Structures are given as C-alpha cells and as structure tokens.
C-alpha cells in the first residue's frame, strides 16, 4: 500500500479501457506520435475534451444566471475556458517551482504540470446538468421522494445512493471515462494524470461524505481503482483515496474564477455597480492601476485581471509550502485558498458573500430555479416508469414505448439492462441536456402549445 505519492507516477501518461471485464492499458493511434511530436500526451487530452459534444453543450448550460439573455454573461463553457486558463497559469507556475527545487521528474517540463491542470479544469464541469446546481437538486429530489421508491426497491445500497445523488463531479468523470468518444470502452481515454487531477472527491457514495459530494459512481469504480494504482494515490479506506495534488490547483482555479467573475456578470446585469466591485478587489489591487481605463467595464476587467494574478501567485506559493503533506495524503486544509494570505482569503470571501446576498437571491433567478424542479421532474416522470415497466414488469404501455424512443439516438435502454444501468442512462440523458433543450422538452411533454 502506498504511503507517499511521487511525481513520476502522478504524471503518468498511461491510458486505460475495459476489455473482457478488466481494465487494461491501451494505446490509441494519436498517442503514438511520441514525445518529440507536435502534441504531448497532455495536449492530446486537451484536444479530446475540446472537441467533445459534452464540452460543446456547456455553451447552453447555466453558470449562475439560467437562460440569460445578455451576450456577455458567463455560461458553463466560457467559465470552463477561463478556469482552464487560470489553471494552466497556476500549473505552469508550480511546474517552474518544482523544476527549480529538483522535484520534477526527468523527461517532464514545467508546462506538463500546466497542461494537466488545464485539462482537468476544462473537463471539471462536463457533468453539470441543466440549470446548474439547482438541476442537481431537482434530480436528487425526484429520486428521493417517497412515492418514487418503488422504482428503487431492488437496487443495492450503493446503486440506490448513486441514483439518488446526481453529482456533477461524478458525471464529469463518467463522461470522460465511459460516455464520450469510445462509449463504454474507456470514454475519451485520457491520461491517468489528467483523470487524477479531475478527482476533487476521490470516493463513492459509500464514503461518510458521499451523499453530499463524491466523484465515483459504481459504474466507474473499477476504472478508478486501476487509475489510482497507476498514479500511486494513497489509500484513505475502502474505495477512497487521497487526492492527486494537482486536483487542488484545479479546485483553486475554479474557486478564483467563480468568485471574481460572477461579480463581473452582476455588473453587466445591473445587479451590482462597478464601484462595489472595485471595493471588493481593493485588497488585491490599487485604484491607480486602472486609471486609464476608458469605461467602467474595462476598469473592472483590468482590476479583475490584477486580482487573479495576485491570487495565482499566492496559491502557487501555498502549494509548494504544503507539497510534502499533499504527497503524503495528509493535507489538512479545506483547500489551498483557505491557507493563502489574508488579502486573498478576504477578497474571495467578500466576493462570495456579496454574490450570495445580491446575485443568487435575485427575483428572476429564483423564479427560474423554482421552475427547474417541475421542468426536470416532468422528464423523469415520463422516462423512469417506462424503464421500470420494460425491465421489471416486462411490458410497456404505448406511451411508455414512445417515451423510450427518445433515448434511441443517445444510449437506448435495453430489456437486458439492469434497473441501475437503465436509470444511469436516463441520468446521462437528462443531465446531458442543455437548459434550452430541457425547458423545450418539458414544455412539449406538457402538451401546451401543441395545437395552433
């Protein structure tokens, strides 16, 4: 059993796929380019995420403001690209420090660290359902209602927990490891290093915190066991591991971006003034730095850029300070930002507090979030009973047969599927929808407007 991680293993470029019931190493044609080719293995990872359908769909998924009409408001796609940019800078900075300290393995460059973090950042939100975190809550709520337990009675505890706890992080892993590119045959077949850096919560729903946050469904557990062994992740119990150190950089990049860029959206939507944003950023910037800005929008953007740069420096220093604990799997901090300078902590805390009081509780946002529950619920009302009728009862009413046709172009439910497999396919389908397509399907299913 590993008691300490090392960078040689943590930067593994090995890829895996299932074969004959086992998870085995694999090499695909594009990974035979070699170390001196135009693309490194980590750049190949990046390209696979960028060209995936799941990544493209993020363009119509909520970041903070559902179905926003404003052209400059962030969605999950723009958020992910910006997080990846910050993550790359963070990784490159740490990579240089690791190299200068003699920690970087021979054959690896500082930019390899940046590329791995960039890939993880780019993929971290692929599994977010329509309407963001409210969509997660709506999917969980439906499967946890007492009247719906009849559909789950024959599932074992781990399977039931998975179905009742839709988790965007776990679905991001499921997309890259099982669904996209090579469906049920290794997914995107990313490098072990990129997969490890993506795991913010490397455990299943069986973990004490698993009903809140987790990264591993039962469907991906055999795959992750093999990846964890390849990376040399420290075991933290049954099917639970200490985090890959680079996952902390991915997490920090995400936190920095959503804390500061949510404020920029709020200014665009007239929910906050630029003066309020400048006040929040004052501890990490100085007003004179943007004195020549020609507009309040440009001024906010310049100050935001300075603040992000300061935060990147601080996080990189904090990472190196705690590198030994991260490699031992004994890091005790909530995250890296919690151990950064008071200036960084205060700025992000104030930004999140302002967002909570002035943005997240705004009337128009609340209305859309309330509507998310009946919207996604109506789709599950149709699909889950149909899947149950096919598999458990072996007979379908006409409406149920029509309902299952909706999944035919995606990942059709088959009579030989288990109920767990069928419900995971339904969650793949609904969770993969954009805000617009989910809203349109719910409206169409209601029959409203069908007659002109």
Predicted ranges, named:
Residues 1-28, 32-35, 385, 394-452:
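Acidic, carboxylate-rich catalytic segments that either coordinate divalent cations
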Residues 2-38, 50-61, 81, 85-86, ...:
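Sequence-structural signature of the catalytic-core scaffold of metal-dependent phosphohydrolases
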Residues 44-56, 340-344:
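Acidic, low-complexity proline/glycine-rich segments
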Residues 55-59, 148, 181-185, 204-208, ...:
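Intrinsically disordered or highly flexible coil/loop and linker segments, enriched in small
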Residues 61-71, 354-359:
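A short small-residue
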Residues 76-80, 249-252, 304, 308, ...:
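Amphipathic alpha-helix face/heptad-repeat signature
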Residues 285-421, 433, 451:
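C-terminal subdomains that position terminal phosphate/3'-OH groups for nucleotidyl transfer/ligation
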